[in-house]
């Protein structure tokens, strides 16, 4: 018996990340090779022509799982009955723009989108915010959708997680697939804290294998935290394919389960590990049956606590900067 199509809304559909994302969703990489999808694509009025071009290419791939495509500039059309919503579109920082202005510009976008999701999306919609500042944008969307369960809103920390994995693989000379229990705490920003104290590679402790706190502090964390800037420097454009890949990983694990593996998701806190409730924070989680669960009982040493406090402070400042816009 063929499955009924799932409706996947993608905002910023004409953008670089969208272009890397849509073909993989239509190919079944995100929701499974037996799951038909209907893509509901949102972008600004001036981008509609570009979205049409992308849709022509999607048609030309003749994906067996692509059951339909909707193109719109109206969030209520894009989010109608959506099972999954990938909020990729966000206002990028332009030259001379203060972070405060960026937060405010995005707060307006994500308030509108949160309200539209609240009105028309499936009550079980799984929302992933990719557009930066991702944690705070996800917080705004969640707060603007009081009738949806707050745990349905998540922010993308998976790119930081995958970047950390690849750095550990390079350092240990082991394949990425052999590394487990690595995760990232906090904000999707250079303050994130990638934590390999519990990680193993082929069952061996990564911490013991590397055994180099100076490398951790001076090389590993800055490399992972500033990787986005390094890619802009090298490529002249921000990371798009790797961000799309991380979004696919995040949603795939959330929907289909992580098979016991620990992954990282930005999720609303319930006070776990001393993080104030409602903060959209990167946590180690496992996923099963469409739900995520925070890994409990991890010891936080003094160094880790200091790093967590730094990223939390940044998130609290961002949150304070948009509070007046949330009514």
UniProtKB/Swiss-Prot annotation:
Query: What is a GO molecular function of this protein?
Result: L-malate dehydrogenase (NAD+) activity
As recorded in UniProt, its EC number(s) are 1.1.1.37
- What biological processes does GO assign it? malate metabolic process; tricarboxylic acid cycle
Keywords assigned by UniProt? NAD, Oxidoreductase, Tricarboxylic acid cycle
Residues annotated as binding substrate are 93, 99, 132, 163
Annotated SUPFAM superfamilies: LDH C-terminal domain-like, NAD(P)-binding Rossmann-fold domains
Q: Could you say which residues bind NAD(+) here?
A: 12-18, 106, 113, 130-132
Which Pfam family, just one, is annotated for this protein? Answer: Ldh_1_C
Which top EC class applies here? oxidoreductase
What does the record give as the active site? 188 (proton acceptor)
Keyword NAD assigned to the entry: answer is yes
Catalytic activity, reaction form: (S)-malate + NAD(+) = oxaloacetate + NADH + H(+)
* Lineage top rank: taxon: Bacteria
- Which family, according to UniProt? Belongs to the LDH/MDH superfamily. MDH type 2 family.
Its function, per the record, reads: Catalyzes the reversible oxidation of malate to oxaloacetate.
Kindly provide the name given to this protein in its UniProt entry: Malate dehydrogenase
Gene from which this protein is expressed: mdh
């Amino acid at each position: 018996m063929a499955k009924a199509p799932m409706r996947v809304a993608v905002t910023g559909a004409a953008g670089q990340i969208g272009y890397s994302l849509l073909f993989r969703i239509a190919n079944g990489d995100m929701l499974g090779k037996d799951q038909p999808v209907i893509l509901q694509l949102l972008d600004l009025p001036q981008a509609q022509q570009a979205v049409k071009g992308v849709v022509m290419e999607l048609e030309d791939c003749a994906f067996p799982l692509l059951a339909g495509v909707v193109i719109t500039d109206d969030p209520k059309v894009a989010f109608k009955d959506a099972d999954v919503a990938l909020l990729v579109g966000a206002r990028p920082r332009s030259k001379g723009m203060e972070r405060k202005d960026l937060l405010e510009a995005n707060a307006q976008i994500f308030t509108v989108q949160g309200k539209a999701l609240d009105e028309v999306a499936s009550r079980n919609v799984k929302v992933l915010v990719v557009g930066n500042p991702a944690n705070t944008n996800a917080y705004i969307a969640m707060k603007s959708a009081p009738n949806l369960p707050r745990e349905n809103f998540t922010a993308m920390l998976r790119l930081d997680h995958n970047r950390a994995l690849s750095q550990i693989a390079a350092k240990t000379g082991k394949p990425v697939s052999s590394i487990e229990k690595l995760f990232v705490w906090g904000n999707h920003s250079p303050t994130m804290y990638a934590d390999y104290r519990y990680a193993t590679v082929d069952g061996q402790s990564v911490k013991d294998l590397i055994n180099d706190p100076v490398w951790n502090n001076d090389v590993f964390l800055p490399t992972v935290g500033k990787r986005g800037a390094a890619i802009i420097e090298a490529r002249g454009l921000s990371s798009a394919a790797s961000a799309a890949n991380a979004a696919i990983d995040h949603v795939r694990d959330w929907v289909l389960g992580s098979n016991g593996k620990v992954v990282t998701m930005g999720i609303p806190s319930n006070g776990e590990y001393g993080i104030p409730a409602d903060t959209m924070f990167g946590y180690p989680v496992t996923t099963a049956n469409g739900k995520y669960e925070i890994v409990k009982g991890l010891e936080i040493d003094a160094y880790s606590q200091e790093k967590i406090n730094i990223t939390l402070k940044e998130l609290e400042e961002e949150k304070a900067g948009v509070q007046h816009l949330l009514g």
